[in-house]
Design a protein with these regions (language model features):
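Short alpha-helical transmembrane segments in multi-pass integral membrane proteins
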Residues: 1-24, 78-145, 189-246, 302-368, ...
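Helix-terminus/linker motif at the lipid-water interface of multi-pass membrane proteins
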Residues: 29-51, 120-129, 185-194, 253-286, ...
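N-terminal transmembrane alpha-helices
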Residues: 8-40, 44-45, 61-73, 77, ...
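Transmembrane helical elements of multi-pass membrane transporters/channels
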Residues: 19-35, 141, 175, 204-208, ...
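Hydrophobic transmembrane alpha-helices of multi-pass small-molecule transporters
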Residues: 62-65, 179-183, 209-213, 286-289, ...
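Short runs within selected transmembrane alpha-helices of multi-pass transporters and secretion channels
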Residues: 71, 141-160, 168-176, 197-212, ...
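Small-residue hotspots at the loop-to-helix junctions and early N-terminal turns
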Residues: 47-58, 135, 139, 198, ...
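Small-residue-rich hydrophobic transmembrane alpha-helices
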Residues: 50-110, 149-168, 274-340, 373-395
Length: 452
């Protein structure tokens, strides 16, 4: 991948790039299994349990995406300082992102613990009593895990900024082994149902968080935090981190709020539609694991190239990595369309009605993913790595409210559309985002941004 001659030494030779990408693919595959294991094992309790977990996970994803966006801001700043050979500022930016995420995650956790019932009722309105009971149980323990998720995301992003993706992969492996083992023991061994699934996820996330923070403090780590004094707020660095993190956080937050609005709409279609949507969401996430991994890699690669002043290399690597993301999307989604979708659905205890709806939306997902997913989600990370987060935020917010929310509500409320209509709104969102991001990339405006 790095045979092209540059005016200077390639920053990411093929072996180094492979060493970055392969653990990221494994990490993404492992991280998805937490949601899959919960949904799969909880499905033995019944559709009401699956629906309750699904509704809460929609909100959980909102929080995780906002925290990931803030971590991305820190990773972009740290990677550019690393590329610029400013290790002191890189370490200082690492400390600041840990501070930011500690404060944010603790505040959100406190709000959810106190007001979880009001939040669920306000977002999803009137839902079945059994679904609400399961959702409240799962929501409480999910909230307690937010600080662990926040600090884990920060630590993992900082390791990736250094080009070390093995640490986050191994932490994800430990997290998944504990989660799946805990699910098996607590759900099937002790009959704890949704409570068991939530408790297993909480314990696994706490262990992963502790492991990443411990490794971040090892003497050989470039971004090691040098004492608690380093965690004191630094206005200059916080501003630089938030210049990327806030637009990305608003983008991800508004994106998930849009999904919450759509989830609320989905809940009006009945328990079968909620369960089908949950299973389709969980299984379809697997199909874009390679493209998601490339999306994480470009933050490190493009960030370090631009930090070193190598715009030519940044463009070259960005193009090749985007093509790699497309290759992964084609292989995964075509395989699923012809072979894997029906097999995947047999793993879940769905009613015939829910299974038919899930299969329908998954196959449409396969078709649109091979053309639009990488340019809609991998490509904007290239722009963010350059500090062009405000543009990606603006496009994503407009597209989400017009297509993902507006179109869906129009189809369901005015034309009595079903679950597929909601997913079609999502696909239109991808198309619009892809066009805007591709035009921005080709014109080169993203290269004019400054982070450090």
């Amino acid at each position: 991948m790095t045979s092209t001659k540059f005016h200077s030494q390639p920053l990411f030779p093929c072996r180094q790039l492979t060493a970055l990408l392969l653990p990221l693919i494994a990490e993404q595959a492992l991280s998805v299994t937490i949601g899959l294991a919960d949904t799969l094992m909880v499905s033995s309790v019944g559709e009401a349990a699956v629906s309750g977990v699904s509704l809460v996970d929609t909100f959980n994803t909102l929080m995780i995406q906002i925290m990931s966006a803030l971590a991305t801001g820190g990773a972009v700043v740290a990677s550019q300082y690393i590329g610029h050979r400013e290790e002191k500022n890189a370490r200082a930016s690492a400390a600041q992102i840990l501070f930011i995420l500690s404060v944010f995650s603790l505040a959100v956790a406190a709000v959810v613990v106190v007001g979880r019932h009001a939040i669920l009722r306000g977002i999803f309105g009137s839902i079945d009593a059994d679904v609400m009971r399961y959702a409240e149980t799962y929501f409480l323990l999910s909230a307690l895990s937010y600080p662990f998720i926040g600090l884990y995301n920060a630590g993992a992003a900082l390791f990736r900024a250094q080009g070390n993706s093995k640490v986050s992969m191994m932490s994800s492996l430990v997290m998944n082994v504990v989660n799946i083992g805990g699910n098996a023991i607590l759900i099937f061994g002790f009959g704890m149902g949704v409570l068991g699934a939530a408790l297993a996820s909480l314990i696994s996330r706490a262990i992963a968080c502790i492991a990443v923070l411990f490794l971040l403090q090892k003497p050989g780590c470039m971004l090691r935090i040098e004492g608690l004094a380093a965690l004191r707020p630094n206005g200059r660095l916080i501003q630089r981190i938030l210049r990327v993190g806030i637009p990305a956080g608003i983008e991800n937050g508004m994106f998930q709020i849009g999904k919450l609005s759509v989830a609320s709409l989905t809940s009006t279609l009945g328990t079968a539609a909620i369960a089908a949507n949950a299973v389709a969401n969980t299984t379809s996430t697997f199909l874009n694991i390679p493209a998601s991994a490339v999306g994480l890699a470009v933050l490190t690669v493009v960030g370090q190239c631009l930090g070193a002043g190598e715009k030519e290399q940044a463009v070259w690597y960005a193009r090749r990595l985007l093509l790699l993301a497309y290759a992964g999307a084609w292989i995964m989604n075509l395989s699923a369309f012809f072979f894997a979708d029906k097999l995947a659905l047999t793993l879940f205890h769905l009613s015939p009605e829910a299974q038919a709806m899930a299969l329908q939306v998954m196959q449409w997902f396969n078709i649109f993913s091979i053309f639009f997913w990488p340019s809609s989600f991998t490509l904007p990370n290239i722009l963010r790595a350059a500090g062009d987060a405000s543009f990606t935020m603006s496009v994503s917010i407009v597209s989400m409210w017009v297509f993902r929310v507006g179109f869906c509500y129009l189809m369901v409320l005015c034309f009595h559309g079903q679950l597929l209509s909601i997913w079609m709104g999502m696909f239109l969102d991808w198309v619009f985002r892809s066009v805007c991001f591709m035009v921005r990339f080709v014109r080169g405006k993203w290269l004019e941004q400054h982070v450090i």
